[in-house]
Structures are given as structure tokens and as C-alpha cells.
């Protein structure tokens, strides 16, 4: 994936360093969906978002950047209007079957969730990561992903995803839902 093309798609000259490094990792060390089950950074022209609302005020606050699972859910950075740097903005998941939820407080927390190495399940009322140990197959490049996260961000493999999700929802869910209801 070309980082310049990714930035141009968002109409920005800069993107979060964590995202730029992730794109480099996916392009040069691993590949799409090979380091965390169902996940891959992609260039998205907001077609998925437009199925929720075509209002420019809605679209300009959301930055889709990755596939969340193999069935069409996707992750976005949400500009919540607080003037914080983009790498500290909350992450939202839009479900392919419906359901829109805050999933992480920022991009780094999402990267930590990805170390669980299973697709996110997005229902109307909740989101969760579930791993059936009897059926689990580790992603081909998970070890490289874990090494990269440890070296760059001192993050280890996560065993419980609910703490990150709950913390993010406690912090942002109410404001996000209030904002989102204006458009959907």
C-alpha cells in the first residue's frame, strides 16, 4: 500500500505515526489479514460510511482505515471535536450487519486489541472478541506483529479485550451516540 495514496485519500499530509508505521508493517513485513485475523489496513473512499449517511458533516468527522473482520465491518477514527491529535482520537467500528460502537480510546489501544488475533464480532447491542481455543489458528505473521508492537510500543499480547473496550466506551460512548443520532 502506498502511504502517499493513503494520505491523499483522507485529504491530509500527515496521519498518526502509529498508523503510518502499521501501514509500513503491513506492506513490507507482513500482508493484509496475515498478522491479526480479519484485520487489514485499506484505502477506503467512505463508501461504507455513505451507507449510513451522506451528510458531509458526518463524513468529515470519520476516517475509515481498516477492515475489522472478514464479513465487511470496518474501523474508523472519529474526530470528536475536542482538538486532540488524531492519534488520540477514539476508534469506532461499523458493523456489516448493523451496530456501531466505540472500540478503543485511540489507535494504539486498537493495535493492542489486535494482538488477541481474532475477528471482532459486531452486534447491534455489543461488540466483543471471542476465541475458541479448539478452533483457533494463529495468524501467519502474529509473532512478527507482536515483536513489532513490543519493540515500538512496549505492548504485549492481550488476554482480555473487555477492559480496553469498556474503558473506551465509558469515556466516549455517550458523546458518540449523541453525535451519531444526528445523522442516523
Place the predicted regions along the sequence by residue:
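A surface-exposed partner-binding patch
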Residues: 1-84, 146, 155-184
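Mixed-charge (acidic/basic) macromolecular-recognition segments
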Residues: 112-177
Amino acid at each position: 500500500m502506498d502511504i502517499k495514496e493513503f494520505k491523499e485519500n483522507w485529504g491530509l499530509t500527515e496521519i498518526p505515526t502509529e498508523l503510518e508505521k502499521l501501514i509500513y508493517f503491513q506492506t513490507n513485513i507482513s500482508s493484509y489479514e496475515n498478522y491479526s485475523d480479519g484485520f487489514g489496513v485499506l484505502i477506503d473512499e467512505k463508501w461504507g460510511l455513505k451507507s449510513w449517511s451522506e451528510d458531509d458533516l458526518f463524513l468529515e468527522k470519520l476516517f475509515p482505515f481498516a477492515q475489522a473482520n472478514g464479513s465487511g465491518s470496518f474501523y474508523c477514527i472519529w474526530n470528536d471535536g475536542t482538538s486532540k491529535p488524531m492519534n488520540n482520537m477514539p476508534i469506532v467500528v461499523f458493523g456489516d450487519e448493523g451496530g456501531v460502537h466505540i472500540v478503543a480510546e485511540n489507535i494504539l489501544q486498537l493495535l493492542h486489541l489486535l494482538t488477541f488475533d481474532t475477528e471482532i464480532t459486531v452486534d447491534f447491542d455489543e461488540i466483543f472478541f471471542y476465541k475458541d481455543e479448539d478452533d483457533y489458528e494463529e495468524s501467519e505473521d502474529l509473532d512478527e506483529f507482536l515483536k513489532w508492537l513490543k519493540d515500538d510500543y512496549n505492548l504485549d499480547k492481550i488476554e482480555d479485550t473487555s477492559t480496553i473496550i469498556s474503558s473506551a466506551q465509558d469515556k466516549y460512548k455517550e458523546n458518540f451516540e449523541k453525535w451519531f443520532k444526528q445523522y442516523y
